[in-house]
Amino acid sequence: MKVSEFTFDSSTAHNKIFTRLYEPDGEPKAVLQISHGMAEHSALYKPFCEYMAQRGFVVVINDHLGHGRSVTSGALYGHFGEEGGLYNVVEDQRNLQSIMREKYPELPYFLMGHSMGSFIAREFAAAYGNSLTAVVFMGTSAGISTAMWKAERTYLNMLKKAKGARAKIPSLEKIATGPYNKKFKPNRTNYDWVTSKEEEVDRFVNDPLCGFPLTVQGYIDLGTLLYAINTDQWYRRVPKDLPILLISGENDPVGDMGKGVRRVFDKLNKTGHDVKLTLYPRIRHALITEMNSAQVYEDLYAFFSSHLPKAEEPVPEKETEAEPEVSTETEKSVENPAAEEEKETEAAAAEKNDDMPEENAEFPVI
């Protein structure tokens, strides 16, 4: 396989977006674009990218605005921009797709988003779903109520006025993700909720490009997108014939321990979408680093492969009985732990401010 790096211009016109590209040996089957989660970066996906490239997929993944090596001098980790927020990131995904389409114009095109990356992928699917062969929303969320979001937005705007849009306020991180860890007491770290594999948690904790808080504006942008992708309008905007896989752990607090992901699945189902659900018992948030990561890899590969063109399959000599229809909901058990896979770590330090808000009111988790 060939591994390369490049940058492209962000939709903000002020940033360069760092990107990793994995190209298989031989004739490629399809392109898979990956959208990573909050406070992480593209290098964490190296083992999965290599796995897919070894099976004939071109895989491309960038560092989002405010993340990884897309953060340059004068920029802030956890800041998506002064205007446009995460919708800028959605347009960056579209720009990257255009670049890959120029290179591979005829190949099937898949998109997979994890956590915050699934929020980005969900908006992409609503805006540009007709450009995709299929999409995976991994570790996604059913969002919060309108009343809760209004209260949260009011509080964040108060902080923005008092401290500034680019301020880093430690208490916001505790409010946003702190409750996730309460479900796994006693806690060894602040990130026990991410995965049940302690060595993977330690890698996340010790990676200077992971675990940083967003700016005040960053949390406003995140909440705005999360609310939008769980409205009735979003369900109407997503093409009904776009194949969708929802995949999550039943112990993932971002997905409300499976209940929130089921709500998204049920509503997609009721609105006539082509959707399947896979929930893994006893599994937490970061599926590709979990105890059952080998099974997750296989399931993702099987989903993408099932949507490749069938023209090259041999024609049976005689008509065979049709296979039973696959259920739109599938649950996987975790019996075979995955072999530990080494991830690439980039060395850099995230900017952190010590400003604390005068208010410390609790609001719903983003």
Where are these regions (language model features)?
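N-terminal cap/lid segment of alpha/beta-hydrolase-fold proteins
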Residues: 1-24
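Catalytic active-site module of serine/aspartate enzymes centered on a nucleophile-bearing elbow/loop
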Residues: 274-317
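Alpha/beta-hydrolase active-site loop
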Residues: 81-101
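Alpha/beta-hydrolase-fold enzymes
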Residues: 123-209
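Alpha/beta-hydrolase fold nucleophile elbow
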Residues: 104-115
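Conserved alpha/beta-hydrolase
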Residues: 49-74
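Active-site glycine-rich loops that stabilize anionic/oxyanionic intermediates
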Residues: 36-40, 250
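Short beta-strand/loop motif that positions the catalytic acidic residue
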Residues: 246-248
